[in-house]
């Protein structure tokens, strides 16, 4: 995830089949793909004891699932999603007061830019670690506050890497994680590493159709679609998924993600 499954690069597309419109892609992200990272969110929140008293800012918050999980623990949440207005709209819909903890209702901000000045945040999450380089958010956290950065684990422990290699890394696509990616991003952001962990995040889908939709929703294949066409990219993804199709037709790909906790000096 450095670049990650949540990186989205708008492009034009070529090919015989038109690509899904952005709203459909965002819904596929929200309904299929985003939940694959729930174990990562839970591990980070458990380690940092997220709950009442936590003031959390989520960077590149997608359609808001990680924020919803923090709010259900009692955290006051804010999130920014500058890359996808469609995902941001879904986050706003998902994070209505009826859906989550009443403790956080009065403190919620969801937008495409940083929130207005308010009480410093006690936690910043960048489950797409590259978001920390795009957004000057560290200044909004209190001194000593943890910042969570996350990314893919070793390629040999991530079955999905066999599929993601079809994406073009030179055009916003995926590349294998390097050992010190997260530490390098933390250093560039002026943060001090203070612990790390690994989490199993298997990608499980009801079938190949669901898997293709979920993977395409990441935006990582946009350049490939532009170059080769939607039909060809769909075909190649299905071929790459074949070893992971189970007897009942479901798709199961074991993966490991890594997270780093860094501190605001």
Predicted regions located by residue number:
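A short glycine-rich, Lys/Arg-flanked "PGG" loop and its adjoining helix->strand segment in the class I
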Residues: 133-146
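Class I SAM-dependent methyltransferase SAM/SAH-binding core
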Residues: 55-115
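Conserved Class I S-adenosyl-L-methionine
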Residues: 2-9, 37, 63-65, 185-265
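Local beta-strand N-terminus motif with an aromatic residue
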Residues: 53, 120-121
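A generic alpha-to-beta junction signature in SAM-dependent methyltransferases
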Residues: 48-50, 71, 140-143, 245
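Conserved catalytic/acceptor-binding region of the Class I
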Residues: 144-206, 222
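Conserved class I S-adenosyl-L-methionine
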Residues: 2-54, 84-100
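A short SAM/SAH-binding and catalytic strip from SAM-dependent methyltransferases
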Residues: 121-135, 153
């Amino acid at each position: 995830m450095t670049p990650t499954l949540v990186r989205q690069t708008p492009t034009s597309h070529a090919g015989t089949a038109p690509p899904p419109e952005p709203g459909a892609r965002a819904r596929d992200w929200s309904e299929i793909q985003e939940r694959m990272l729930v174990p990562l969110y839970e591990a980070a929140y458990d380690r940092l004891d997220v709950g009442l008293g936590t003031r959390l800012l989520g960077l590149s918050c997608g359609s808001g699932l990680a924020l919803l999980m923090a709010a259900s623990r009692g955290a006051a949440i804010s999130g920014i999603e500058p890359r996808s207005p469609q995902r941001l709209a879904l986050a706003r819909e998902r994070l209505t007061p009826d859906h989550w903890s009443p403790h956080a209702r009065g403190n919620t901000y969801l937008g495409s830019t940083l929130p207005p000045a308010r009480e410093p945040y006690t936690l910043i999450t960048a489950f797409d670690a590259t978001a920390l380089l795009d957004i000057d958010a560290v200044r909004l956290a209190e001194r000593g506050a943890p910042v969570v950065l996350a990314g893919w684990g070793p390629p040999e422990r991530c079955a999905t890497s066999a599929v993601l290699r079809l994406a073009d890394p030179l055009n916003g696509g995926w590349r294998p994680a390097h050992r010190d990616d997260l530490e390098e991003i933390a250093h560039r952001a002026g943060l001090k590493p203070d612990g790390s962990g690994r989490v199993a995040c298997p990608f499980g889908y009801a079938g190949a159709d669901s898997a293709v939709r979920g993977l395409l929703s990441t935006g990582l294949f946009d350049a490939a679609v532009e170059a080769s066409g939607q039909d060809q990219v769909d075909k190649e993804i299905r071929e790459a998924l074949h070893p992971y199709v189970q007897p009942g037709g479901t798709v199961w790909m074991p993966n490991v993600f890594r997270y780093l906790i860094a501190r605001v000096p």
